[in-house]
Amino acid sequence: MLEGSHSRSDVPRSDIRIAEIDGLRGLAVLLVLLWHFIGALLPQTTVLLKLVSGTVIFGRTGVDLFFVLSGFLIIGILVDRRDADNYFHVFFARRALRILPPYAMLLIVFWILTALLPAGYYFGHQIPWWSYATFTQNWYIIKLNNWGPGGASVTWSVAIEEQFYIIFPVIVYLIPRRHLFPLLICIGTGSILARAACFLLYPQNAFAPYVATFLRLDGLCAGGMLALACRDAHLWRTMIAHRSTLMKVNGTFAAFIPFFLVALHWSPGTTMYYWGHTYLTVLYSLTLATILTNSNSRLSAALRLGFLRALGAISYTAYLVHPLFIGLAFTVVGKREELKSMSDAFLLVLAMLVTLLYSKASYILIESKLLAIGHRLEYSARGSGSRAADLSGPSAVSKGSQLQR
């Protein structure tokens, strides 16, 4: 596997591991952890605490970053490998080896704790087991109009990605490559409009526009469009030629973050569902485009830091299990989950340490070994033909699929 050694004049391929993308994963999960461990639990009793909470709430947007990254990585892999005889077999096998083991471990621990501990916000049976097992819990959340048990609440986004993994391999396989970019534009735009319409027509269900799959496809599609742009020789050369402009535009969008936070404070639903998620999709897509084309920028250097890359390696499991460990810490001592005292802070630090240690152990003992098995499942090349001709392009020769979350 090549790692961080390519020039940014080269087209990114799915067999090259880009260090900055690992750093972006780490940043995404760090944002979520900061929100759930600090911002969401602070009392709104003073101006300072309101200011801290109102700033750290930006951590919620880590999920939007994950969606853009997933769209970029998965669509890139699918496009690079759509000519393989074992296209579906290898893709789904690798996805299963990556996604299912940490997810299954979470559900097992969650169901055991639900049976042992008193029912409360974090543990309960509000969402049936089969919904988690079939990755349909996001639709059950819409039905309930609440998160369900907090210990497994973040799995709604995993459900969306799993549904994406099922549908888009078929789309990429069947649709000619030249039609994929406009198709992603249409799907992404439709998702943006449908999300706004849903909130306008059904404001009483604030969860639907947040967790419904077809209302959250814009980030995944934007990442996919960037993957296609990187695999088009003309578009890639254009991006390289205008890399400084990309960086400036990205900086301009980032400078808009304080206004976004103020709007989010005063009107969360209106902000997020009418324009907030769209803004974040553009911001994070520009950020990804910037690091792909500017390896010498300060942003790229920051994302190559060992801390962020190490966090990126365990980001999936840490994202999955951290609410469960927060809930476990407070439930065992019979306290409400909040950050009002030193004892609360101690419980949260303990939950954070357990989250990181569990995630690291899971990665070393289980996930890394299963990923190695997945990488031994190679895509087989098909002989020349119409589909092979359709793949002709800058990255049709890529050999592996190392860039999988």
Regions of interest found by a model, annotated:
Residues 1-20, 27-30, 34-60, 74-89, ...:
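Alpha-helical transmembrane segments in multi-pass integral membrane proteins
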Residues 22, 91, 155-159, 165, ...:
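Short alpha-helical catalytic segment bearing the HExxH-like zincin motif
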Residues 23, 93-106, 172, 309:
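Alpha-helical transmembrane segments of multi-pass membrane proteins
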Residues 105-113:
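Hydrophobic alpha-helical transmembrane segments that constitute the membrane-spanning cores
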Residues 148-173:
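Function-critical hydrophobic alpha-helical transmembrane segments in multi-pass membrane proteins
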Residues 183-191, 306:
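Central hydrophobic cores of alpha-helical transmembrane segments
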